[in-house]
């Protein structure tokens, strides 16, 4: 038997992080009973985003063009390359108002339990970017979680022998913390106090 439209909507809403069956059911009923125009806008926005948004060819963040605005900006320092896990982390770095270099967004972290290794993260693309002859320093701004640390260690081991300077943001970011939840002042301090990796 095919699921009903309501069941399909509830199941679709469950794909969102932190949304379980009960929350998905409440959302579905709210959209259908109280906010059908909102449901239409939501559906249209999701469809538009899926059709228009892709990955930047240089930094791997989300963009509607081939190259994002940050990568296209002549005001950014091309000698600095900050590696972050997600676009949200990149936005947090921008909010510090202290970093004016370029970015590379991993779109994840090394997590063997989740089946994510260096190949799945596309670290070969990061390597190509870091060794382009322009980048002088790679700043690792992965989260201070076990997976973020493993990712930073792997990238350091990959780049250090190639002569690229590799630094890590300081531990102003709490151990086990994620950049998304760190205030911009703490993140700015961590960025200023970054350290050389691999020593």
Curated annotation (Swiss-Prot):
CDD domains for this protein: TOPRIM_recR (cd01025)
PROSITE patterns xref list: TOPRIM
Keyword Nucleotidyltransferase tagged: no
Xref: InterPro entries: DNA_Rcmb_RecR, Rcmb_RecR, Rcmb_RecR_Znf, TOPRIM_dom, TOPRIM_RecR
UniProt keyword terms in alphabetical order: DNA damage, DNA recombination, DNA repair, Metal-binding, Zinc, Zinc-finger
Residue intervals of the Toprim domain: 79-174
Classification via NCBIfam families: recR
Function description: May play a role in DNA repair. It seems to be involved in an RecBC-independent recombinational process of DNA repair. It may act with RecF and RecO.
Listed name of the protein: Recombination protein RecR
Organism, as annotated: Dechloromonas aromatica (strain RCB)
């Amino acid at each position: 038997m095919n699921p009903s439209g309501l069941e399909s909507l509830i199941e679709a809403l469950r794909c969102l992080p932190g949304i379980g069956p009960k929350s998905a059911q409440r959302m579905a009923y709210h959209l259908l009973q109280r906010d059908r125009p909102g449901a239409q806008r939501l559906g249209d926005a999701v469809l538009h985003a899926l059709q228009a948004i892709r990955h930047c060819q240089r930094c791997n963040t989300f963009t509607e063009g081939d190259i994002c605005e940050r990568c296209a900006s002549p005001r950014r320092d091309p000698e600095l390359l900050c590696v972050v896990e997600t676009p949200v982390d990149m936005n947090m770095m921008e909010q510090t108002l202290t970093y004016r270099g370029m970015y590379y967004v991993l779109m994840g972290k090394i997590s063997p339990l989740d089946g994510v290794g260096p190949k799945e993260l596309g670290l070969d693309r990061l390597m190509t970017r870091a060794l382009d002859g322009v980048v002088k320093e790679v700043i690792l701004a992965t989260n201070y979680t076990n997976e973020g640390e493993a990712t930073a260690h792997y990238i350091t081991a990959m780049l250090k022998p190639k002569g690229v300077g590799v630094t890590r943001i300081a531990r102003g970011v709490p151990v086990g913390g994620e950049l998304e939840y760190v205030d911009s002042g703490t993140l700015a301090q961590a960025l200023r106090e970054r350290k050389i990796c691999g020593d």
